[in-house]
Amino acid sequence: MQRTLGGTNRKRKRTSGFRARMRTPDGRNVIRARRKRGRHRLSV
């Protein structure tokens, strides 16, 4: 039987990648908050 919870990089990038975040105002807020907090990785 096949495991279903592998996760795919295409889906991951498309939903929570940098360009996906920049596409919406709320996503831009997320990036801004992570910059302010000093996160090394801003997005996936």
UniProtKB/Swiss-Prot annotation:
Q: What is the species of this protein? A: Nostoc sp. (strain PCC 7120 / SAG 25.82 / UTEX 2576)
- Taxonomic superkingdom: Bacteria
* InterPro entries associated with the record: Ribosomal_bL34, Ribosomal_bL34_CS
What family, per the record?
Answer: Belongs to the bacterial ribosomal protein bL34 family.
Keywords on record: Ribonucleoprotein, Ribosomal protein
Please list where the region (Disordered) is annotated.
1-26
- Any one annotated GO CC term: ribonucleoprotein complex
Q: What is this protein called?
A: Large ribosomal subunit protein bL34
What Pfam family is a match, any one? Ribosomal_L34
Q: Does the keyword Ribosomal protein apply?
A: yes
GO molecular function of the protein, one example? structural constituent of ribosome
- Whether Ribonucleoprotein counts among this entry's keywords is yes
Listed under GO biological process in this entry are:
translation
Question: According to the UniProt entry, which residue ranges have a biased composition of type Basic residues?
Answer: 9-22
